[in-house]
Amino acid sequence: AWSINPQSAEVNNNYGWYLCNTLGRVSESLTRFDIALSDATYPSPFVAYYNKGICTARLGQYAQGEALLKQSIAANPQFVPANKELARLKMNEGQASSADSYFRIYQSQVNQMSADDLLLGWQISQRMGQMQEAAEYEMQLRANFPYSDELKQMTTGH
C-alpha cells in the first residue's frame, strides 16, 4: 500500500501505528500521523489523533498526548476508546483521580469490558484505595478471562 500511495492518510496512519505499537519506534511514528493529519480529505482524523496521542504519551509527553486524545474526541465525540486512553495516560502520569473520572466515562460508554479494560479499572481502583471496586474488577477478570495476559499481569505484576 505504501509503494502505491505513500501520501495516503490512511496508509500513513496505519504505518505510524505499526511503527509505534509493534516495532516500538515511537518517535518515528509521529511523522506518519502528521502526514495523515495534514490531509484535509482524510475521513477519520480522530483515529490519527488517537494514535498520535497514545504514542506521544509513551514518550512521557503527557500534556501533548492528552491534548491529542481530546482532539480525537472533539473530532468524533462517539469515539469511545479515547476516554479509556485518557484514563491510562492520567494513571501513568500519577493522577489517579483524573484517571478514575475518564475511566468512568469510558465505562458508561461500553457494553462489555475487555480484559485490558478490567486490568486498567483494577489498577486505577488500587491506586485510589478503592479495594472493594478493585476486587470486583479482579473477580470479573478471573471469571471472564482466566487465561489472559492481563490476569497474569495482575497477579504477578509482569
Where are the model-predicted features located?
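Canonical positions in the second alpha-helix
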Residues: A1, I35-S38, Q71-S72, I105-Q107, ...
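Structural marker of alpha-solenoid helical repeat scaffolds
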Residues: I4-N5, D39-T41, A75, S108-V110, ...
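Canonical tetratricopeptide repeat
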Residues: N14-Y15, N51, E85, L120
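Structural signature of tandem alpha-helical TPR/SEL1-like repeats
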Residues: L23-I35, L59-Q71, G94-S101, Q132-E136
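Terminal, low-structured helical/coil segments at or just beyond the last alpha-helical repeat
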Residues: I105-H158
